[in-house]
Amino acid sequence: VESILAIETSVPEASIALWSDGAWLFEAEFVSDRNHNSMVFEPLAQALALLEGRELSTVLVGTGPGSYSGTRIGIAAAQGLAIAKSCPAAGIGSIAATPPARSVARPAAAHTAATAIGDARRGLYYISSITASGEAEEPELMDAAVLEQRLASIPDDLLFTLDAPTTLGLNDQLQERITRTQPQARLLVDVWLGLDEVRRQQLYSKPLAPTYLRAPFTSKAKQGHPLLRKG
């Protein structure tokens, strides 16, 4: 019996889902901008109680892009559960676990390709295409002008965003093509079930880490800071 617990906390609309032997045993959503850390544990405990002695096979966690603190909380919870339950954990890009991304993986889908767009802040935006395996490519950064050119070159793609479309700096025609959506824990499981064993093992072997739009920024201590003074 395969039992999979999924955690998605990269967005304020967080969710947890438990799937076992072809059936959904538990799903919960909770909304929080600041305190995922205090809200995630109750639904996790409720989900684990429903295992009723069955072993947990895998813990999945959405790795963003999204809230840095929210994503880190989900990763920490996944790591802790994997240790406690002696099972592997794997991270999946949250963009793939959205309804538009999953819709192109269905037979006879209206669209055969999907691309996510997002606000990367400081005048930059990102795009991420959904691969044939159902996963999301690494986000690619660009300015507004290049973004419009890229989107105009893929007129048949299903476009979606985790942000408000009005924040993307696009013309009205392109905005009308874009669907706003959110990742869901149950769709992390959906992505996972569609992967072959080779890809699953690759994901197991990768350390859990957030999907960064930019390299993590570390501020340098100013000259004269107590830590820089010579003893």
Write out the residue ranges for each language-model feature.
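Oxyanion-binding and handling regions
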Residues: 1-24, 31-39, 90-231
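Short, conserved active-site loops that position catalytic residues or coordinate cofactors/metal ions
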Residues: 42-44, 63
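Phosphate/pyrophosphate-binding loops at sites that engage ATP/ADP/AMP, CoA/4′-phosphopantetheine
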Residues: 44-58, 150-158
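Short, well-ordered alpha-helices that flank and scaffold nucleotide-derived cofactor binding pockets
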Residues: 46, 79, 83, 104-105, ...
